[in-house]
């Protein structure tokens, strides 16, 4: 596998040469790639990019359009299931069948939230005589996600899929 860096604003952003993490297959101990170690500069750049997206194209998408994008992500995962499974096996050290199930679960989360994106809206709740309460769902804004090493595919689907479906960046 090629070494990986950060993807910020749709572009590869390299880490400093001394800010690299060697990734090892936990079942063999074999190093198979290096990834960039993000620091404050990369975090600040990613947050600024996400804020700009909220004020730009992403923030202007309808819930339906966001949902379609999540469904596209699910399709990409399914179309590349063998590659994603092999990566998950090496990265996490799980057996092939379990890693494949995790990729499928990630795709299913993106499908679920993609299909739910335009179904969750405001509610009108009866209150007192002659009064109602209106609730309105709004995105929180920029969200950060901590992904554990042992279930990365499932947690990415579960947390990132939900956040994006609701309009967060």
Regions found by a protein language model. Give the residues of each.
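Glycine-rich loop-to-alpha-helix module at the N-terminal edge of alpha/beta enzyme cores
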Residues: 32-120
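Short glycine- and Lys/Arg-enriched binding-loop motifs that mark or flank ligand-binding interfaces
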Residues: 6, 89, 118, 126, ...
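Short connector loops/turns at beta-strand edges and beta->alpha or beta->beta junctions
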Residues: 26-28, 40, 161-163
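Hydrophobic face of amphipathic alpha-helices that form TPR/SEL1-like repeat modules
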Residues: 1-28
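Residue-level signature of catalytic and energy-coupling elements of molecular machines
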Residues: 10, 29, 66, 110, ...
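Short glycine/serine/threonine-biased micro-segments
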Residues: 8, 34, 91, 139, ...
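Conserved small-residue-rich beta-alpha loop and adjacent elements
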Residues: 123-169
């Amino acid at each position: 596998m090629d070494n990986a860096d950060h993807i910020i604003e749709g572009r590869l952003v390299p880490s400093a040469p001394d800010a690299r993490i060697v990734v090892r297959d936990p079942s063999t101990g074999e190093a198979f790639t290096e990834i960039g170690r993000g620091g404050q500069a990369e975090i600040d750049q990613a947050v600024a990019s996400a804020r700009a997206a909220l004020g730009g194209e992403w923030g202007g998408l309808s819930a339906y359009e966001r949902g379609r994008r999540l469904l596209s992500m699910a399709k990409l995962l399914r179309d590349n299931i063998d590659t994603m499974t092999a990566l998950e096996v090496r990265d996490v050290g799980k057996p092939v069948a379990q890693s494949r199930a995790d990729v499928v679960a990630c795709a299913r989360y993106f499908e679920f939230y993609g299909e739910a994106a335009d179904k969750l809206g405001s509610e009108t709740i009866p209150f007192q005589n002659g009064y109602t309460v209106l609730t309105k769902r709004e995105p929180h804004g920029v969200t950060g996600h901590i992904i554990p090493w042992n279930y990365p595919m499932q947690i990415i689907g579960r947390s990132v899929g939900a956040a994006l479906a609701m309009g967060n960046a």
